[in-house]
């Protein structure tokens, strides 16, 4: 009977007529009012709100905890200045409930609260409440400040853990009935808290050093993804590495490649090492390889990493480690970062679209996911192609690259100061080829990124060596156009002018003719080409392996 008297709102809704049936004649009391826990934790009230026009007209009820979990007098400027809170900006629709009440419910569920007041709450507990400090119902925006002490720390070294940040900020609040949808669009980490995360150990500077590049503006690292992504056995896989390595810098496993029964690591990696040694000897240039060590079991990841480094031997610094960071999770990321701090940590985001896609109204955005990758230690992460390739994206996604590479950068809502945290290198992939690169560089403003072009190099009509070379040449073409070498002409005309004396780029025009027609109108006449459109890569004899 005590439960009926304590949770009377539930009693009324679930057990109509309970008062008469139990012989209770008292008035409805405030929830838990008869329980005196040193007079702590005053009870919350329930409020109802009419659903929005066009939605259900049923009046729904939400727990209003705004008196405790909201403080709209707080200013973002002061919160940032004090440096004691992680700030999170959400897009959350009104969903038929009072907006502030729902936002406060999110803050409560994401910190110290629950759906009822509990007797164990004390004065200290309230000091670590998450607080709603800003709402804009019309634009469906809310911001919550999370006190740093809320977040879990390692018992081994006191370091911070991203899984704790995500558990609170994007955990149970994603499944609450009064939150129709909510998505994180930006997150701010105070510098004092950032210092407790690992951050990257290596960056593109390490690649430039190995490749003998300028350490300030070393430019594009021309890379590829071995294609087909699955189906090659060890020897053909090694031959593909050799073919690309004749013209390119960097070769990576595709994200599903690892230790398939038809291409086991103990047979494939030796073939890769042999191919790389041959390419280095023949070209006089260093080569890099990114090996996939992703696994469910941390012990398996470590075993893979140790085996690969043993095979590379004196060339160990030429080897990066790839981890499918989204699907394998933060534990796998930290295993790689902490056990192999001397290796370039290649973060692949396969699967991220399940929560980051613009079509998804829950989770977080690609910007947030990418920013988190720098915090937890990625040396490089795939960022799509900013609408210049086949992946979903927009030219404005260059803000993602700025957040990864700069020491201070603005996001959709917050300006983040990194205070010396090593940069994370944008890795671009997905439908890219030489012809698409100049406009990409112009939009980004520089070419200090890693390219991993699979079809864009292995699809070149003359082979992967020429495909890789064409990408390097188009970076040079963009730089020359930028410097005014070709006079006052458009970027497309500048690239065409460069192509007149560079056969590899000219071959890209002939290979990717749909791109040629769309990006470089009039290219055939300007290059003096009179032939018909040919089937992509038809003239490349794969059996010769592009020696």
Swiss-Prot record:
PROSITE patterns: RUBISCO_LARGE. Mg(2+) binds at residues 252, 254-255. It is found in: Plastid, Chloroplast. The record marks 390 as: Transition state stabilizer. It catalyses: 2 (2R)-3-phosphoglycerate + 2 H(+) = D-ribulose 1,5-bisphosphate + CO2 + H2O; D-ribulose 1,5-bisphosphate + O2 = 2-phosphoglycolate + (2R)-3-phosphoglycerate + 2 H(+). RuBisCO catalyzes two reactions: the carboxylation of D-ribulose 1,5-bisphosphate, the primary event in carbon dioxide fixation, as well as the oxidative fragmentation of the pentose substrate. Both reactions occur simultaneously and in competition at the same active site. The gene is rbcL. It is an enzyme of class 4 (lyase). The basic functional RuBisCO is composed of a large chain homodimer in a 'head-to-tail' conformation. In contrast to form I RuBisCO, the form II RuBisCO are composed solely of large subunits. It is not clear if this is the true start of the protein or not; this is probably part of a polyprotein. Homodimer. Binds 1 Mg(2+) ion per subunit. Signal peptide: none annotated. This is Ribulose 1,5-bisphosphate carboxylase, chloroplastic. It holds the Pfam family RuBisCO_large. Keywords: Calvin cycle, Carbon dioxide fixation, Chloroplast, Lyase, Magnesium, Metal-binding, Monooxygenase, Oxidoreductase, Photorespiration, Photosynthesis, Plastid, Transit peptide. GO terms for biological process: reductive pentose-phosphate cycle.
């Amino acid at each position: 009977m005590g439960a009926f008297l304590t949770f009377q709102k539930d009693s009324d809704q679930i057990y109509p007529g309970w008062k008469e049936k139990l012989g209770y004649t008292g008035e409805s009391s405030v929830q838990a009012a008869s329980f005196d826990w040193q007079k702590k934790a005053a009870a919350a009230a329930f409020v109802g709100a009419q659903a929005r026009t066009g939605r259900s007209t049923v009046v729904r009820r939400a727990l209003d905890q705004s008196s405790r979990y909201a403080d709209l007098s707080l200013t973002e400027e002061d919160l940032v200045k004090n440096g004691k809170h992680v700030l999170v900006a959400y897009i959350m629709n009104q969903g038929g409930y009072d907006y502030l009440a729902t936002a406060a419910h999110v803050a409560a569920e994401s910190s110290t609260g629950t759906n009822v007041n509990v007797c164990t709450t004390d004065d200290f507990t309230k000091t670590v409440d998450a607080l709603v400090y800003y709402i804009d119902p019309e634009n469906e925006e809310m911001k919550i400040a999370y006190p740093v002490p809320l977040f879990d720390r390692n018992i081994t070294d006191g370091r911070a853990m991203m899984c704790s940040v995500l558990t609170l900020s994007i955990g149970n609040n994603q499944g609450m009935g009064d939150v129709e949808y909510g998505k994180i669009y930006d997150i701010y980490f105070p510098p004092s808290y950032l210092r407790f995360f690992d951050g990257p150990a290596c960056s593109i500077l390490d690649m430039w050093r190995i490749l003998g590049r300028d350490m300030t503006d070393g430019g594009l690292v021309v890379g590829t993804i071995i294609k087909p992504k699955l189906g090659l056995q060890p020897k053909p896989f090694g031959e593909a590495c050799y073919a690309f390595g004749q013209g390119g810098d960097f070769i990576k496993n595709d994200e599903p490649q690892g230790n398939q029964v038809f291409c086991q690591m103990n047979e494939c990696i030796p073939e890769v090492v042999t191919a790389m040694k041959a390419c280095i000897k023949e070209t006089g240039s260093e080569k890099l390889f990114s090996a996939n060590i992703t696994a469910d079991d941390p012990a398996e990841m470590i075993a893979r990493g140790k085996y690969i480094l043993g095979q590379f031997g004196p060339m160990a610094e030429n080897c990066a480690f790839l981890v499918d960071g989204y699907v394998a999770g933060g534990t796998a990321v930290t295993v790689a970062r902490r056990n192999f701090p001397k290796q370039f940590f290649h973060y692949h985001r396969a699967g991220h679209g399940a929560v980051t896609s613009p079509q998804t109204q829950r989770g977080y955005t690609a910007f947030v996911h990418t920013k988190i990758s720098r915090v937890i230690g990625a040396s490089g992460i795939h960022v799509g192609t900013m609408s210049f390739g086949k992946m979903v994206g927009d030219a404005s996604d260059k803000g993602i690259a700025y957040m990864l590479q700069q020491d201070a950068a603005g996001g959709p809502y917050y300006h983040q100061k990194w205070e010396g945290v090593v940069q994370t290198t944008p890795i671009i992939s997905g439908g890219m080829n030489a012809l698409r690169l100049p406009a990409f560089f112009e939009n980004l403003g520089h070419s200090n990124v890693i390219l991993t072009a699979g079809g864009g190099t292995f699809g070149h009509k003359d082979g992967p060596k020429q495909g890789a070379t064409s990408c390097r040449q188009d970076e040079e073409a963009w730089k020359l156009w930028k410097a005014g070498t070709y006079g006052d002409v458009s970027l497309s005309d500048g690239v065409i002018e460069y192509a007149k004396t560079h056969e590899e780029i000219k071959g890209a025009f002939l290979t990717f003719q749909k791109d040629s027609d769309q990006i470089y109108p009039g290219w055939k006449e300007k290059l003096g080409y009179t032939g018909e459109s040919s089937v992509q890569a038809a003239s490349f004899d794969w059996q010769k392996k592009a020696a």
